[in-house]
């Protein structure tokens, strides 16, 4: 689960992470009041969307204009900038060409920046440990830094048994070139970040940039905080921070029915049981010259109703030109899948090619149900056959 920058800062501040004063606003007048309450002479106006790269982004209605993070040197400038942001679509590297509508802004105190650094925590699958990632190249896309200058990336893995220790913080401080009192400040900063990460079941906490001010302080100038969805049941206060307007409606509907759905940009809808098989299905669709429209794992114990819901989710995407159902029945019975597919196809008046590959428990019964349905369902014998048939059917229907 993602949250907005201002929410992330509020969460981290409770753990002692240093952030600047600021306030959220939903209208230009609210923004003016926040700016007055904070006091000047400089403010930063930040668009709040669930995407990075806002400063370098551009608004759809003004592609050659300013980005989604702007400095204002008067209350009037604050209002003007907020007027230009609210209700507009901001496009960044992470939003894709569709962009995201700005529905709120964050007004923050200005800051005397001496250095910009990078600091994050994440679960490193290679080491199976929470890992601190730091760099002297803050304020930039960390992926670009890692690719072009890997020597500038510092990683420190935390042993889960001993947890965070002060020497971890000192490693980071020295790696970032901090000196004197800044070293102890960094140790406390990183320790607070680690405690928040562990207490709240975060999947990533990213501070980019972490700035050194003219006074030598360490401040989190930005904050990206993501949480493990599987742990939200024990963090009801965090779950309340969810902004569903920032999420894909189809993905939200899928979550309500315990379906794992991620929308993609292709034209072949996929319904599969098992994440590994789903990824293999997407790969083979690409191999045969098409693009998957989604990742959809119905799970091992899906009911007829859940299968019907999954089918509707796929067809809610107007870009879908064909559907491939690929089921290996172990716990999942092929006849249940077949009943769900037939019911869904009838309910939504299917008008795109449908290819179904079934294998496993009750496979013959499943095939019989589809064959007797009277629907134009194309049967496939194996995964390669299924991918080839759905791509061919889509091209012929075009």
UniProtKB/Swiss-Prot annotation:
Keywords: ATP-binding, Ligase, Magnesium, Metal-binding, Nucleotide-binding, Tricarboxylic acid cycle. PROSITE patterns: ATP_GRASP, SUCCINYL_COA_LIG_3. ATP binds at residues 46, 53-55, 108, 111, 116. One of its GO terms (molecular function) is succinate-CoA ligase (GDP-forming) activity. Pathway: Carbohydrate metabolism; tricarboxylic acid cycle; succinate from succinyl-CoA (ligase route): step 1/1. Binds 1 Mg(2+) ion per subunit. Mg(2+) binds at residues 208, 222. InterPro entries: ATP-grasp, ATP-grasp_succ-CoA_synth-type, ATP_grasp_subdomain_1, Succ-CoA_synthase_bsu_CS, SUCC_ACL_C, Succ_CoA_ligase-like_bsu, Succinyl-CoA_synth-like. One of its GO terms (biological process) is succinyl-CoA metabolic process. Substrate binds at residues 273, 330-332. It comes from the Bacteria. The keyword Iron does not apply. Its cofactor is Mg(2+). It catalyses: succinate + ATP + CoA = succinyl-CoA + ADP + phosphate; GTP + succinate + CoA = succinyl-CoA + GDP + phosphate. GO terms for cellular component: cytosol; succinate-CoA ligase complex. Residues 9-253 form the ATP-grasp domain. Its EC number is 6.2.1.5. Succinyl-CoA synthetase functions in the citric acid cycle (TCA), coupling the hydrolysis of succinyl-CoA to the synthesis of either ATP or GTP and thus represents the only step of substrate-level phosphorylation in the TCA. The beta subunit provides nucleotide specificity of the enzyme and binds the substrate succinate, while the binding sites for coenzyme A and phosphate are found in the alpha subunit. HAMAP family: Succ_CoA_beta (MF_00558). Heterotetramer of two alpha and two beta subunits. Belongs to the succinate/malate CoA ligase beta subunit family. This is Succinate--CoA ligase [ADP-forming] subunit beta. It comes from Paramagnetospirillum magneticum (strain ATCC 700264 / AMB-1). The gene is sucC.
């Amino acid at each position: 689960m993602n949250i907005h920058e201002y929410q992330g800062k509020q969460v981290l501040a409770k753990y002692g992470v240093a952030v600047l004063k600021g306030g959220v606003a939903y209208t230009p007048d609210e923004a003016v009041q926040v700016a007055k309450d904070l006091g000047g002479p400089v403010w930063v106006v930040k668009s709040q969307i669930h995407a990075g790269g806002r400063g370098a982004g551009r608004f759809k209605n003004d592609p050659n204009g300013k980005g989604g993070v702007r400095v204002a040197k008067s209350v009037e400038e604050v209002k003007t900038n907020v007027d230009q942001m609210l209700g507009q679509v901001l496009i960044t590297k992470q939003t894709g060409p569709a962009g995201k509508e700005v529905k709120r802004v964050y007004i923050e105190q200005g800051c005397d920046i001496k250095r910009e650094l990078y600091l994050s925590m994440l679960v490193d699958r290679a080491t199976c440990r929470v890992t601190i990632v730091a760099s002297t190249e803050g304020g930039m896309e960390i992926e670009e830094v890692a690719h072009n200058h890997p020597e500038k990336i510092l990683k420190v893995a935390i042993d889960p048994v001993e947890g965070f220790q002060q020497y971890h913080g000192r490693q980071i401080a020295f790696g970032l070139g901090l000196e004197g009192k800044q070293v102890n400040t960094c140790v406390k900063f990183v320790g607070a970040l680690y405690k928040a990460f562990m207490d709240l079941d975060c999947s990533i906490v990213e501070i980019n940039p972490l700035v050194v001010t003219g006074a030598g302080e360490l401040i989190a100038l930005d904050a990206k905080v993501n949480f493990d969805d599987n742990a939200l049941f024990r963090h009801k206060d965090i779950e309340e921070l969810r902004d569903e307007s920032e999420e894909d409606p189809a993905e939200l509907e899928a979550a309500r029915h315990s379906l794992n759905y991620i929308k993609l940009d292709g034209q072949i809808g996929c319904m599969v049981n098992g994440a590994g098989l789903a990824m293999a299905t997407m790969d083979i669709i690409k191999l045969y010259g098409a693009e998957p429209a989604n990742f959809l794992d119905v799970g091992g114990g899906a009911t007829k109703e859940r299968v019907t819901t999954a089918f509707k989710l796929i067809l809610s995407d107007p870009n879908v030109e064909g559907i491939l159902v690929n089921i290996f029945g172990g716990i999942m019975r092929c006849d249940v899948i077949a009943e769900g597919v037939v019911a869904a196809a009838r309910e939504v008046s299917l008008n795109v090619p449908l290819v179904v590959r079934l294998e496993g428990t009750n496979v013959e019964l499943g095939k019989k149900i589809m064959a007797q349905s009277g629907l134009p369902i194309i049967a496939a014998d194996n995964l390669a056959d299924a991918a080839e048939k759905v791509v061919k059917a889509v091209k012929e229907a075009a």
